[in-house]
Amino acid sequence: MANHKSAIKRHKQSQKRAARNRAAKTRIKNVVKAVRAAVLQKDKDTAAQALTAAMSVLDKAAGKGVIHWKKAARKISRLTKAVGSVE
């Protein structure tokens, strides 16, 4: 454990940030999984709703620096393409 006051504070801050980032990444995985599941079920309405939610979560995560904005854009693009292919 850190000995200096500032090091102790930084350690606490990094733990809080890590927990927040972990939660955001888990949320991303869950919404992406929901979109992919809807696409596999060939349920266009559910897939479209799940895609809207996924886009929101991905954009928020990118805006907060949890993931890179280009990674978010890439995931959104691929999910949109998958939802578009559902008939």
From Swiss-Prot:
One of its GO terms (cellular component) is cytosol. SUPFAM superfamilies: Ribosomal protein S20. Coiled coil: none annotated. Pfam families: Ribosomal_S20p. One of its GO terms (molecular function) is small ribosomal subunit rRNA binding. Residues 1-26 are annotated as: Disordered. InterPro entries: Ribosomal_bS20 (IPR002583), Ribosomal_bS20_sf (IPR036510). GO terms for biological process: translation. Keywords: Ribonucleoprotein, Ribosomal protein, RNA-binding, rRNA-binding. Belongs to the bacterial ribosomal protein bS20 family. Binds directly to 16S ribosomal RNA. This is Small ribosomal subunit protein bS20. The gene is rpsT.
